Amino acid sequence: MSIKNDKWIRRMAEQHKMIEPFAPHLVSRCDERSIISYGTSSYGYDVRCADEFKIFTNINSAIVDPKQFDSKSFVDVQSDVCIIPPNSFALARTIEYFRIPRDVLTICLGKSTYARCGIIVNVTPLEPEWEGHVTLEFSNTTPLPAKIYAHEGVAQLLFLQADDVCETSYKDRKGKYQGQTGVTLPRA
């Protein structure tokens, strides 16, 4: 299994629509101001966060149960920024829509800019032949409110190509998050 470089990422995005919309180079400025970078890097792709957020709240004193998740545990926010309460979390989604090839596994890592502020991003691997918007989870590990910026880089995806094609892909087994759009809550 090998990690794929910028040339491969560009080719797959342009010829196979692996990433849409796609930035072929790293973008770190917009309208003459610095932003948290997004786009193609040496061995990965830095994704952007859309302006749709679900901020966790405990106003209903609900129990968090992944098998019976109560959507009332979130407050929906549409904004260029998301303020995550102390020791809480928020869900968001990527601007980019992904179509992962059958012989590729994609791993997501947080960006150091956010990690150095105590904001951790978590995404499970994007499996072979999965497609959709990536649902992002941001944990604020600090005792202070934390800010996430929409339309800027929030995480990096690494593409690992297998030596052999898998026998059963995510699409083959009809994975429950296949083709997801928007911020997707847990499904049991």
UniProtKB/Swiss-Prot annotation:
Catalytic reaction annotation: dCTP + H2O + H(+) = dUTP + NH4(+)
One Pfam family this sequence matches: DCD
Protein origin, superkingdom: Bacteria
InterPro entries for this protein: dCTP_deaminase, dUTPase-like_sf, dUTPase_trimeric
Positions annotated as active site in the UniProt record: 137 (proton donor/acceptor)
GO BP annotations listed: dUMP biosynthetic process; dUTP biosynthetic process; nucleobase-containing small molecule interconversion
Pathway: Pyrimidine metabolism; dUMP biosynthesis; dUMP from dCTP (dUTP route): step 1/2
Major enzyme class: hydrolase
Alphabetized UniProt keyword annotations: Hydrolase, Nucleotide metabolism, Nucleotide-binding
Keyword Nucleus tagged: no
This enzyme's EC code(s): 3.5.4.13
Chain's role: Catalyzes the deamination of dCTP to dUTP.
Subunit structure: Homotrimer.
HAMAP family with a match to the protein in the record: dCTP_deaminase
Protein name in the entry: dCTP deaminase
Organism per entry: Dichelobacter nodosus (strain VCS1703A)
